[in-house]
Design a protein with these regions (language model features):
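N-terminal Rossmann-like NAD(P)+-binding domain of SDR-like oxidoreductases, especially those catalyzing
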Residues: 1-172, 225, 305, 313, ...
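Short alpha-helical
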Residues: 13, 38, 78, 180, ...
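Conserved donor sugar-nucleotide recognition element shared by glycan-biosynthetic enzymes
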Residues: 141, 149, 182, 250, ...
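C-terminal substrate-binding subdomain of Rossmann-fold SDR/epimerase-dehydratase oxidoreductases
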Residues: 191-331
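Glutamine-centric residue-chemistry signal
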Residues: 74-77, 177, 207
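Hydrophobic alpha-helix immediately C-terminal to the catalytic Tyr-X-X-X-Lys motif of short-chain
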Residues: 148, 152, 156, 189, ...
């Protein structure tokens, strides 16, 4: 084994893929998740599961007394619109929860922390594609919390000598993504197409996103767990954009997924949402240089894979909720 890793949020969309990647790379994996948004069946076979809130004493004690050498932190509140509506709740999970596990990590055997961060820290006005040194001016409480998280992780690295790496994701998509919210736009469109509902586009649909497939993100986490770290001279020193560098409009995603589904769909436009970024593309040359990582899965391959998963998942849900299946479970 290469060491023991705790993946917080490992029953969620991204975290479960990260946990799978660690298992494939022969790490001993424990997943901690409160299942508030994650699913128990997302936890990969071979991983130990601990049902606990990232803010709990149990989570802190697990890290303090366990033999984990890596803390991979994916537990988060990820809905930008929700963060605008309730910034206190957002910071409770995304900052206080992080601090709780950082305290456990420094009391235990953790030698490296890999933090899931976000391109939301950059805000609206940076030149595209955005590199890691760009000004930080987040326009949502979610983005502010992610930036604060990077500073806290950097501080723990400086104070306690823990190696730290922050991964700033662009817009991640792929199997197991929640269909709710703009962050899951590919899953939301796929679900609508499978169920015969209209595609809801917030605003005019000309806003752009840098779409990165979840398997590429999982690979970046393994690279971040193994790389040599550079001196920690500032918050950007060990931060890496995990992205493709390409802009894709929401309208294009709607059209491309309609083509994959073989169904013409006219989007239904809704008002723009507070906190949404107009354009986004992140430069990933630094990750290529320091981590030896690059995105490999194109939209041409990633969109059909995601749509197939949503369609198959819809079929599984239908079978689980069919009258005969319900009666069988009751017997």
């Amino acid at each position: 084994m290469n060491g023991a890793v705790l993946v917080t949020g490992g029953a969620g969309f991204i975290g479960s893929h990260v946990a799978e990647a660690y298992l494939a790379a022969e790490y001993e994996v424990t997943v901690l998740d409160d299942l508030s948004s994650g699913r128990r069946d997302n936890v990969p076979d071979g991983a130990r599961f601990v049902h606990a809130d990232v803010r709990s004493a149990e989570a802190r004690e697990l890290l303090a007394t366990g033999k984990f050498t890596i803390l991979n932190h994916h537990a988060a509140q990820v809905d930008v619109a929700y963060s605008v509506a309730d910034p206190v709740a957002d910071v409770g999970v995304n900052v206080v929860g992080l601090l709780n596990v950082l305290e456990g990590a420094r009391a235990g055997h953790v030698t490296r922390i890999v933090l899931a961060s976000s391109g939301a820290i950059y805000g609206q006005d940076a030149a595209l594609p955005i590199d890691e040194s760009a000004p930080k001016l987040p326009v949502s409480p979610y983005g502010v919390a992610k930036l604060a998280s990077e500073y806290y992780v950097t501080m723990y690295g400086l104070l306690y000598g823990i190696e730290t790496v922050a991964l700033r994701y662009s817009n991640v998509y792929g199997p197991r993504q929640d269909a709710r919210g703009e962050a899951g736009v590919v899953a939301a469109f796929s679900h609508a197409l499978v169920t015969g509902q209209p595609l809801t586009v917030y605003g005019d649909g000309a806003q752009t996103r840098d779409m990165i497939y979840v398997a590429d993100v999982a690979a970046a986490n393994i690279a971040a767990s193994r790389c040599s770290v550079v001196p920690l001279t500032h918050v950007d020193a060990r931060a890496y954009n995990i992205a493709t560098g390409a802009e894709t409009t929401i309208n294009h995603l709607a059209t491309a997924l309609s083509d994959v589904a073989g169904r013409a769909a006219t989007p239904r436009h809704a008002p723009e949402r507070q906190g949404d970024i107009r354009r986004s593309a992140l430069a990933a040359q630094k990750a290529r240089r320091d981590l030896g990582w690059r995105a490999k899965v194109s939209l041409i391959d990633g969109l059909p894979a995601t749509f197939r998963w949503v369609r198959e998942e819809r079929g599984r849900v239908g079978r689980r909720t069919a009258p005969g299946a319900t009666a069988a479970r009751r017997r």
